[in-house]
């Protein structure tokens, strides 16, 4: 499934102070724990391999997008079905120009990436030249199924 949202940077307000403090603590925790999980790093590498194969630059990992994606992949695994977040900007406390989201599940990260690339809408997000940042969350459920969330962003 894919979801795209576009906005101007002037239409967003800053996150309340409490959310900003919580986000700072979460970022510090992720950095202290070694940033992204090995599965997330692998899934991100697969995205960047797909981009490179199509003449596009690699996307940089955005820790805030990673935290959102990782949390949401756990939600999907717990819920047991795929569904998009209703507000892609929720949890981002700074300006953005464009956001995109891919969600999927499967038996391996490679299988999911191949399915994304075979789907025009998912492929469009992965190969969108305007995106410059990514966060990928991966959760493996008790049955061994991988739940992947790819969050894309164009920063001003």
Q: What is each residue range found by the language model?
A:
Residues 37-77:
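A short alpha-helix/helix-coil micro-patch that ends at or immediately precedes a cysteine
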Residues 1-16:
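N-terminal secretory signal peptides that target proteins for export/translocation
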Residues 66-113, 126-128:
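Short, surface-exposed glycine/acidic/tryptophan-bearing loops
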Residues 23-32:
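Bacterial N-terminal signal peptides
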Residues 105-156:
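Disulfide-stabilized extracellular recognition modules
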Residues 36-37, 53-61, 98-106, 110-113, ...:
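Second-shell loop/turn segments in exported
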């Amino acid at each position: 499934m894919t979801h795209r949202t576009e906005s101007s940077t002037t239409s967003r307000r800053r996150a309340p102070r409490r959310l900003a403090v919580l986000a700072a603590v979460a970022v510090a925790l992720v950095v202290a724990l070694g940033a992204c999980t090995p599965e997330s790093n692998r899934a991100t590498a697969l995205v960047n391999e797909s981009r490179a194969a199509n003449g596009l630059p690699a996307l940089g990992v955005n820790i805030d997008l990673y935290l959102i994606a990782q949390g949401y992949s756990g939600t999907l695994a717990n819920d047991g079905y795929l569904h998009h977040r209703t507000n892609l900007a929720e949890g981002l406390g700074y300006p953005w120009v464009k956001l995109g989201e891919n969600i999927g599940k499967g038996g391996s990260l490679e299988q999911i990436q191949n399915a994304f690339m075979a789907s025009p809408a998912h492929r469009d997000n992965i190969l969108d030249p305007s995106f410059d940042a990514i966060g990928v969350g991966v959760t493996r459920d008790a049955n061994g199924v991988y739940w992947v969330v790819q969050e894309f962003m164009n920063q001003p």
